[in-house]
Amino acid sequence: MLQINPNFIKHIEQELPSHLSMDEFILACNRPLRQSIRVNTLRISSEDFIALMTPRGWSFSPVPWCSDGFWITLTHDEQLGNCLEHIQGLFYIQEASSMLPPTALFTNDDADERAPLRVLDMASAPGSKTTQMAALMNNNGLLIANEYSASRVKVLHANVLRMGVSNCALTHFDGRVFGEYQYEAFDAVLLDAPCGGEGTVRKDQNALKEWQLDDVIAIADTQKDLIEAAFLALKPGGALVYSTCTLSQLENQAICQHLLSRYPEAVAFESLATLFDGAAKACTEEGFLHVWPQIYDSEGFFVAKMRKTASVPRIKSQPKAQKNFPFSPAPEKQIAALQDYIQQSFALSLPPGAQVYLRDDEFWLFPAPFSDFIGTMRFQRIGIKLADVLKKGFKIKHEAVIALGAKLGTNANNNSNTNPNNNANTNPNNNSNTNPRCIPLNQAQAEQFLMGRDIDTASFDGKLDLTPKGEMMVSYHGAAIGVVKHLGHRLKNSLPRELVRDNLG
């Protein structure tokens, strides 16, 4: 049962726009959230995903502010987080309102051929907006995803890998350091600030039970520090989006006004009134989006976009360079040998202009612009690990196959066979997979693989060449899900132990 502190009711009554009803607000807070997902276009198109899941009893209603976001209804109970398509990164379970900030950041001049090359996500975990921005960037450029909580960094990293993101570097800092360490370094910054979470009451009925105005005031002080740091880290001409999942103006409009008062000659608010059809319903006088739960039947949310019109003085001097960077550029001869191995074993290629680095006996693929950031601060994780060096040759890493084998070809529009045991090589969903070093799996086989089990080649009903072929990829719905060793009678599973799922479905 929903529990709201009476003090919150009194507080929010003073802030609710006159054209909105308090009764409707309370009713909206009592309704369960509509289930929503975002299709991961790094791995599959929205059209193919809809065609794939519709025969499974899914129906889709588009989220108006995200071309790849959908409210979904299912004809049967299904644990979305445990279904194959989620595990392989075809979609992200994401509340519709939280899709707004990346959409706002990548609009107008920020979405064309001059799209931001260097982007900062200052408070990233668990990764919904990070992976959304990576998809909007099509894995190009550099996306630095920062998270202050050590435990949440692990979740962020897992989601980045699951979704096939390769242009990301992870950091673990208090976001307030970025104004000092990365002064005017980014083309775009997203600050989805830590907040009071007043807008989340529809999924957490206790979110407002202990609400106190003093807590709002305290966290607003932190938000002011963070938005100043975000602005300092932004290049002149760049865009800053500030967002929260809370409703109080103290944490929203007041924070943006604080930045304007701090830098009146360098901050320009950009109106989001035309961000999508119907955006004006939530638009404030300043051009911010203050999303109340009853407007779009969603979580409460706040989004503001600002442009940095001029450089501002840095507050502290340039920090000393970080020493002992453990990576070095790989020699061209070794890169060529690695590329030959990847091509011959998996029929995959490194992206054009790939920045390949070495650490001990490990090859890593770095985002192209990352070299400018070497020595500026400590990074938890950079790009993707490609392969280990063996005595004879290489051993590809799982995350490399997921990223490089993101789209091997699908024909989901012709997928009329939903039998999980149907042989993969005769399933029309896999007919367009022409990669000779990839074995398409059906649902039952994919489940076996993700549970860490070897696959008996007899399950292919004679449709698979039983000649041992060594390392190969396996795919499901046209996207790689891992590596096997083709031994003839069985496909030996190479899934990392930490990714093995004991139960599926």
From Swiss-Prot:
| Single Gene Ontology MF annotation | rRNA (cytosine-C5-)-methyltransferase activity
Name one cellular component (GO) term.
cytoplasm
- Which keywords does the record carry? Cytoplasm, Methyltransferase, RNA-binding, rRNA processing, S-adenosyl-L-methionine, Transferase
Q: Where is this region: Disordered?
A: 409-437
Q: Name one Pfam family in it.
A: Methyltranf_PUA
List where the protein spans the membrane: none
Matching InterPro entries: Methyltr_RsmF_N (IPR031341), MeTrfase_RsmB-F_NOP2_cat (IPR049560), MeTrfase_RsmB-F_NOP2_dom (IPR001678), Nol1_Nop2_Fmu_2 (IPR027391), Nop2p (IPR011023), RCMT (IPR023267), rRNA_ssu_MeTfrase_F (IPR023545), SAM-dependent_MTases_sf (IPR029063)
> Which residues are in coiled coils?
none
EC class of the enzyme, as a word: transferase
User: A GO term (biological process) for this protein?
Assistant: rRNA base methylation
Query: What residues bind S-adenosyl-L-methionine, as annotated?
Result: A123, S124, A125, P126, G127, S128, K129, E147, D174, D192
Where along the chain is composition biased (Low complexity)? 410-435
The Swiss-Prot or TrEMBL record describes its family as follows: Belongs to the class I-like SAM-binding methyltransferase superfamily. RsmB/NOP family.
PANTHER family documented for this protein:
28S RRNA (CYTOSINE(4447)-C(5))-METHYLTRANSFERASE-RELATED, NOP2 YEAST -RELATED NOL1/NOP2/FMU SUN DOMAIN-CONTAINING
- Function statement: Specifically methylates the cytosine at position 1407 (m5C1407) of 16S rRNA.
Q: Write down what this protein is called.
A: Ribosomal RNA small subunit methyltransferase F
Native source organism of the sequence:
Shewanella denitrificans (strain OS217 / ATCC BAA-1090 / DSM 15013)
